Amino acid sequence: MKVIHSIKELKEYVHQCKREGKSIGLVTTMGALHEGHASLIQAARKENDVVITTVFVNPTQFGPNEDYEAYPRTLDADAKVAAAAGADLLFAPSPAEMYPHKDMTWVEVTGPITKVLCGRTRPIHFRGVATVCTKFFNLTECDRAYYGLKDAQQTQVLQRMVEDLFMNVELRLMPIVREADGL
């Protein structure tokens, strides 16, 4: 498995895959990979020629008084899990790589789905999720993106975004997989 950090390298990799007619499956993560993530990578492996996994602790989905700095960053361990599960490429960009400008474009799903549950107490969270996922979908030109049903509200937000923006990606929603201890 190859690990890259730059958008330029990612685009070159994706361009080569598309030139060869390969399908691409995408698993987006914030790292700290576990069996649930591995199951998503394995599902992507079964359905695609190429599997790209992202590890990116996204600062735009953390609000004030949410501990972005304390979020675990375990790239070496994450790379081992991703490789063992069948990923071909791990894209681990820096925040500066993903958000090069202070003023930026946002993608925001509005309406009841983003105002309840997590969205009620974290009002900018889903704007950050939608923005970074749009960037990842565009950068990887993925045919399919894999998400666990554990994140039910997030998957509904992403489904609405994909539908409303006519994105050419199929969201594959997979069953929850738990560790032996139930986590």
Tell me what each language-model feature is.
Residues M1-L183:
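Nucleotidyltransferase catalytic core that binds NTPs
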